């Protein structure tokens, strides 16, 4: 079913009349609220169907998300579902006009259905009233269909209405789908996508303190070529992980994990042989191996939901914290030391809980992103870094207090527009230099990004 199967068609004259009505109301609000900023919002929907129950819900959900970022004592008036041309809303707020415009643009570009919104920000008497997207560090608004500047496509009439409807329907279905589905795939498909996760991560630039194509980051014993060698050396391990999951017949999935872990020990040695004893992917061997095995097991008889895969993972690693961390043995790894010192469970805690940092944070965030592959992955990495108790970061900082700093750094990054603005990217380069100076690294976040890329590739999010 299409969003546009229901609703009353409107003609061009009705649309033009509504434009005049909106302009008069905006002017009135600017006069009666001369010391405030006026924001108006509507949906940018092509064709004659501009209002129905689904479009109203899209608008209300997005509008509520948008206004939640402003002071709760702001006055606002809403006109919703009354006009045949679609729902509209108006709000007056205090603040700096340029900052509010940036907030509106970021909403349009980062909210799952934000690109369907048209938000105008205006005020009397502020010098930056005429600031454009480009003046604020953003690129031009892009066409939903082809990604070229929207003004060019509109002027040249490059696309049909049916093409526009198809893309909007796909966006809506993607944003409202309740859960990711893993289809039954071949060993080659699953393993190749796992390798993509490893290779895409190291190819991404810039990343705070991490190895990338132009920098060793804070890892002076590593470079990108070493990561490529390491990634390729793990193909045999990933093949075995898939076979273990697809062929396992028992009911005690802890036995499946034990078999995987034995292969993981061998894979670590293979990695060290490929990297001259540098630890490039020890964390990924653990986490990526678990996911490959769990997906292969869960989909042996057909498709599986994210929830089903997570339950398999939890059954595989049941009792892992007690076995690895709660014993009285001498701590030999950063994760074990941090559990004994700070009671942080690290990657084992993530695994025991079914990797909530992946399935509840990183993947949903990735699903809502847009732009180039680099932009989407950089923003996703920083979202991960904002929420993860990164054992690599804690180890290098020698204190978990660095996690609060990380939250602040990522908050500044996103307030500046993230990967979609020059200011955001400059900040990320500056942050990379700061990490190198302080010998910090978000290695745990990188491992989580690898998993997210793998899942994104396998399910069609990327």
From Swiss-Prot:
Keyword set, alphabetical order: ATP-binding, Multifunctional enzyme, Nucleotide-binding, Nucleotidyltransferase, Plasmid, Transferase
Q: Name one GO biological process term.
A: prosthetic group biosynthetic process
Apo-citrate lyase phosphoribosyl-dephospho-CoA transferase as annotated region, ranges: 1-178
Annotated stretches, region: 2-(5''-triphosphoribosyl)-3'-dephosphocoenzyme-A synthase:
179-462
Q: Which Gene3D superfamilies match?
A: Triphosphoribosyl-dephospho-CoA protein
Cross-referenced InterPro entries, in alphabetical order? Answer: CitG (IPR002736), CitX (IPR005551), TriPribosyl-deP-CoA_syn_CitG (IPR017551)
Q: What is its EC number?
A: 2.7.7.61, 2.4.2.52
**Catalyzes what?**
apo-[citrate lyase ACP] + 2'-(5''-triphospho-alpha-D-ribosyl)-3'-dephospho-CoA = holo-[citrate lyase ACP] + diphosphate; 3'-dephospho-CoA + ATP = 2'-(5''-triphospho-alpha-D-ribosyl)-3'-dephospho-CoA + adenine
EC primary class: transferase
GO MF, one annotated term: ATP binding
A Pfam family (short name) is CitX
Function noted in UniProt? Bifunctional enzyme that catalyzes formation of 2-(5''-triphosphoribosyl)-3'-dephosphocoenzyme-A, and then the transfer of this prosthetic group precursor to the apo-acyl carrier protein (gamma chain) of the citrate lyase to yield the holo-acyl carrier protein.
| Family of this protein | In the N-terminal section; belongs to the CitX family.
Q: This protein is called what?
A: Protein CitXG
């Amino acid at each position: 079913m299409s969003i546009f199967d229901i609703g009353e068609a409107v003609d061009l004259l009705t649309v033009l009349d509504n434009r005049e009505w909106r302009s008069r109301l905006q002017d009135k609000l600017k006069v009666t609220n001369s010391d405030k900023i006026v924001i108006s919002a509507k949906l940018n929907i092509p064709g004659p169907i501009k209002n129905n129950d689904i479009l109203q819900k899209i608008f209300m959900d997005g509008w509520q998300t948008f206004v939640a970022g402003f002071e709760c004592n702001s006055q606002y008036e809403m006109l919703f579902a009354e006009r045949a041309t679609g729902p509209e809303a108006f709000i007056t707020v205090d603040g700096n006009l340029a900052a509010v415009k940036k907030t509106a643009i970021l909403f349009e570009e980062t909210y799952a259905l934000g690109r369907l919104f048209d938000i105008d920000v205006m005020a009397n008497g502020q010098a930056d009233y005429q600031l454009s997207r480009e003046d604020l560090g953003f690129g031009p608004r892009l066409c939903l269909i082809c990604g070229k500047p929207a003004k060019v496509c509109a002027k040249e009439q490059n696309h049909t209405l049916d093409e526009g409807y198809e893309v909007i329907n796909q966006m809506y279905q993607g944003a409202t789908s309740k859960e990711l589905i893993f289809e039954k795939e071949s060993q080659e498909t699953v393993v190749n996508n796992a390798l993509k996760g490893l290779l895409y991560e190291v190819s991404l630039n810039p990343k705070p303190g991490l190895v990338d194509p132009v920098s060793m980051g804070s890892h002076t014993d590593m470079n990108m070529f070493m990561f490529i060698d390491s990634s390729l050396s793990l193909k045999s391990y990933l093949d075995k992980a898939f076979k273990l999951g697809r062929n396992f017949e028992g009911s005690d999935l802890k036995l499946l994990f034990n078999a995987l872990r034995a292969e993981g020990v061998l894979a670590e040695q293979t990695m060290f042989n490929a990297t001259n004893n540098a630890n490039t992917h020890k964390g990924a061997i653990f986490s990526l191996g678990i996911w490959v095995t769990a997906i292969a097991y869960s989909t042996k008889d057909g498709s599986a939901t994210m929830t089903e895969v997570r339950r398999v993972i939890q059954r595989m690693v049941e009792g892992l914290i007690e076995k690895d961390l709660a014993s009285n043995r001498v701590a030999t790894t950063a994760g074990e030391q941090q559990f004994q010192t700070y009671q942080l469970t690290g990657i084992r805690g993530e695994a025991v809980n079914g990797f909530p940092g992946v399935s509840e944070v990183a993947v949903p965030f990735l699903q809502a992103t847009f732009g180039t592959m680099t932009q989407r992955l950089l923003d996703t990495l920083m979202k991960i870094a904002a929420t993860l108790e990164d054992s690599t970061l804690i180890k290098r900082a020698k204190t978990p207090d660095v996690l609060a700093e990380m939250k602040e750094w990522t908050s500044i990054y996103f307030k500046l527009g993230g990967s979609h603005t020059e200011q955001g990217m400059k900040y990320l380069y500056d942050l990379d230099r700061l990490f190198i100076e302080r010998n910090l690294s978000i290695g745990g976040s990188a491992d989580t990004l690898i998993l997210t890329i793998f899942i994104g590739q396998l399910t069609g999010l990327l």
